[in-house]
Swiss-Prot record:
Sequence positions that bind NADP(+): G14, S15, T16, R17, T39, N65, L66, N92, Y157, S158, T159, T160, K161, I190
Organism: Aquifex aeolicus (strain VF5)
Enzymatic class: oxidoreductase
Gene name of the record: fabG
Gene Ontology terms: biological process: fatty acid elongation
Protein's name according to its UniProt entry: 3-oxoacyl-[acyl-carrier-protein] reductase FabG
Length: 248
């Protein structure tokens, strides 16, 4: 069954590269208008133009820095001048500040929580108006395998990714009466520019932990997000789908 999202408007945070861009492209390929966000407005607009040309859909680029509530509010002013509302929200944007716990500063802790959790909270609140009014919406939060397993040097990041699961399950219960579905996707090791800088020795070490014996691709994550945003997933809410090659 072909998934069609014509007439829908999708906001994907942190979508100028990596998994976020793959998700935005996948939604655009199904006919959705997409809103690209990133800390560089110029880069976001360039990516939006590339996607619009490639898929023949409307695409808009907007600067949004989740460290700043002011930036988020300004971004939504711009967004609501471009579209009448959001039908699909993918909370993908996130940062890391990796350090061993005893060396982690309060700033390392606070910035990761501010972007990955508080930023998600603010973006979601700003996106709900149309979904609730029309009694249809999709929210997909991008968590991580480390939200379930933990990881050395990532106490801050792992905490936020675990927190997104509680956020997802609680919000799903609140919004279900309005037919707004809220789910999460938890990727494992995915080939991105973050993994590209790792040595072959380190990559091999990680691959040995994965039953499928390889890293995933951003598109494999995007495929799951597309499914959750479609009518094929109309009876799924409050769930987490793991895309990790069988790690657990």
């Amino acid at each position: 069954m072909e998934i069609k999202l014509q007439g829908k408007v999708s906001l994907v945070t942190g979508s100028t590269r990596g998994i976020g861009r793959a998700i935005a492209e996948k939604l655009a390929s199904a006919g959705s208008t997409v809103i690209i966000t990133g800390t560089s407005g110029e880069r976001a607009k360039a990516v939006a133009e590339e996607i619009a040309n490639k898929y023949g859909v409307k695409a808009h680029g907007v600067e949004m820095n989740l460290l700043s509530e002011e930036s988020i509010n300004k971004a939504f002013e711009e967004i609501y001048n471009l579209v009448d509302g959001i039908d699909i929200l993918v909370n993908n944007a996130g940062i890391t500040r990796d350090k061993l716990f005893l060396r982690m500063s309060l700033l390392d802790w606070e910035e990761v929580l501010k972007v990955n959790l508080t930023g998600t909270f603010l973006v979601t609140q700003n996106s709900l108006r149309k979904m609730i009014k029309q009694r249809w919406g999709r929210i997909v939060n991008i968590s991580s395998v480390v939200g379930f397993t933990g990881n050395v040097g990532q106490v801050n990041y792992s905490t936020t990714k675990a927190g997104l699961i509680g956020f997802t399950k609680s919000l799903a219960k609140e919004l279900a009466p309005r037919n707004v579905l809220v789910n999460a996707v938890a990727p494992g090791f995915i080939e991105t520019d973050m993994t590209a800088v790792l040595s072959e020795e380190i990559k091999q070490k990680y691959k040995e932990q994965i039953p499928l014996g390889r890293f995933g691709s951003p598109e494999e994550v995007a495929n799951v997000v597309l499914f959750l945003c479609s009518e094929l997933a109309s009876y799924i809410t409050g769930e987490v789908i793991h895309v990790n090659g069988g790690m657990f």
